[in-house]
Design a protein with these regions (language model features):
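N-terminal Rossmann-like or analogous alpha/beta NTP/dinucleotide-binding catalytic cores
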Residues: 49-111, 115-133
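A short acidic, often aromatic-flanked loop/helix-cap motif at beta-alpha or helix-coil junctions
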Residues: 1, 84-87, 144-148
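Glycine-rich, Lys/Arg-enriched anion-binding loops that position phosphate/diphosphate groups
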Residues: 130-230
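Phosphate/ribose-recognition catalytic cores of enzymes acting on nucleotide-derived substrates
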Residues: 184-297
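N-terminal catalytic cores of NTP/NDP-binding nucleotidyl/phosphoryl-transfer enzymes
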Residues: 2-61
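Residue-level signal for inorganic ion chemistry
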Residues: 17, 69, 107, 167, ...
Length: 297
C-alpha cells in the first residue's frame, strides 16, 4: 500500500471528453481539499479487447490520454488488462486494488460506471463498499449536449461519419491524430502540393474518408493545413493513410512528429480524371478554407 492516500477517478476515459473531465476535475478538487494524491485509475487496453479479441477504435492513444490527464492535474495509473484482473469480484477490486494498492480515501466515477467480473458492480455497490472499506464515493451525473448523453461511443460515431465540428464540441478540443511523418509516393510534390504523410497507430480511430480543414502542430508551432484521409483513389492506392498539405511550411518534415487537429469536414474523397483535375480541386479547397475563415472573422 502506498503511504499517501489517494483521490481516485475511475473509468476508461477514451477521448478524455468533457464528461470525463468533470469526473477527473472532481477527483482533483477533492485531492486538493484533503491533501491527497490525485490519481486516474484506468486500463491499458479496453476489457473487450482481452475478453473478446476486439474493441472499438481508440479516440486517444495511451500517450495522448496521459498528456490530457496530466494537464488536468492528475497522475494516470494503468492497470494491465488481464483475464485475472477482469475476473476479480467487485468486492476484491475494491479491497485489493482501491484500498490495499492505492490507499483510496476518495473515489469518483461516472453515473454508469461498472466494475468487477462481468461488470457485476455498479455505483450503488461501490458506495456500499466505500462505507465498508473507509473511502468516500462521489458519483458524477451524466452530461447532456444536444439532447443526448456525452459519451465516447457517440463521439466515435460522429468522427467516423465526418461530423468533426460536433465531435469537437463534445471533446472540448479538436480531435487529433499524432504520428511521425513518413515517405509516401511523393505524388503531392510532383504537382506542387507536397504532403506530410502520417500512418495512424493500429487500432486508432480515423475520420470518415475525405478532405478536412486541419491545424498541424510541429515543435509547438501551429499551422493551418488541409488533410486528406482515405485510400487515394486517383492514384489507385488502397492503403489507409492521412496526407496533410501545409501551405506555409517549406521545411522537410520527414521523420518529425506532428499532431494533426481536425477542424472541419470539407468534402468526400473522390477520384479525378487526371492529376491536373486534382490540382484544381486542391486549389479550390484551399480557397474555400480561406474564404470560410475570412467570413467567420
Amino acid at each position: 500500500m502506498t503511504a499517501v492516500q489517494s483521490s481516485i477517478a475511475l473509468g476508461f476515459f477514451d477521448g478524455v471528453h468533457t464528461a470525463h473531465r468533470t469526473i477527473i476535475e472532481t477527483a482533483v478538487r477533492k485531492a486538493e481539499m484533503r491533501g491527497l494524491r490525485p490519481v486516474v485509475l484506468t486500463f491499458d487496453k479496453a476489457p473487450s479487447e482481452v475478453l473478446f479479441g476486439s474493441a472499438p477504435p481508440y479516440i486517444t492513444t495511451l500517450e495522448e490520454k496521459e498528456r490530457l490527464i496530466n494537464a488536468l492535474g492528475a497522475q494516470m495509473c494503468l492497470m494491465h488488462t488481464s483475464r485475472s484482473l477482469l475476473s476479480m469480484t467487485a468486492e476484491e477490486f475494491a479491497e485489493k486494488i482501491l484500498v490495499q494498492k492505492y490507499n483510496a480515501a476518495e473515489v469518483t466515477c461516472g453515473f454508469n460506471y461498472r466494475f468487477g467480473s462481468a461488470g457485476s458492480g455498479d455505483t450503488q455497490l461501490l458506495t456500499k463498499l466505500g462505507k465498508r472499506f473507509g473511502f468516500n464515493v462521489t458519483v458524477v451525473g451524466e452530461r447532456i449536449s444536444g439532447g443526448e448523453t456525452v459519451s465516447s461511443s457517440r463521439i466515435r460515431t460522429l468522427i467516423s461519419s465526418g461530423r468533426i465540428e460536433e465531435a469537437n464540441i463534445l471533446l472540448g478540443r479538436s480531435f487529433s491524430i499524432s504520428g511521425t511523418v513518413e515517405h509516401g509516393k511523393r505524388l503531392g510534390r510532383t504537382i506542387g502540393f507536397p504532403t506530410a504523410n502520417v500512418y495512424p497507430q493500429s487500432g486508432a480511430l480515423l475520420p470518415m474518408s475525405g478532405v478536412y480543414e486541419t491545424v498541424v502542430e510541429i515543435n509547438g508551432e501551429r499551422l493551418s493545413a488541409i488533410t486528406n484521409t482515405g485510400t487515394n483513389p486517383t492514384v489507385g492506392k488502397e492503403t489507409l493513410r492521412m496526407e496533410t498539405y501545409i501551405p506555409s511550411a517549406e521545411v522537410d518534415l520527414y521523420g518529425k512528429r506532428i499532431t494533426v487537429e481536425f477542424v472541419r469536414f470539407i468534402r468526400p474523397e473522390k477520384k479525378f480524371s487526371d492529376l491536373e483535375a486534382l490540382k484544381r480541386q486542391i486549389r479550390e479547397d484551399l480557397n474555400g478554407i480561406a474564404a470560410f475563415n475570412n467570413k467567420k472573422i
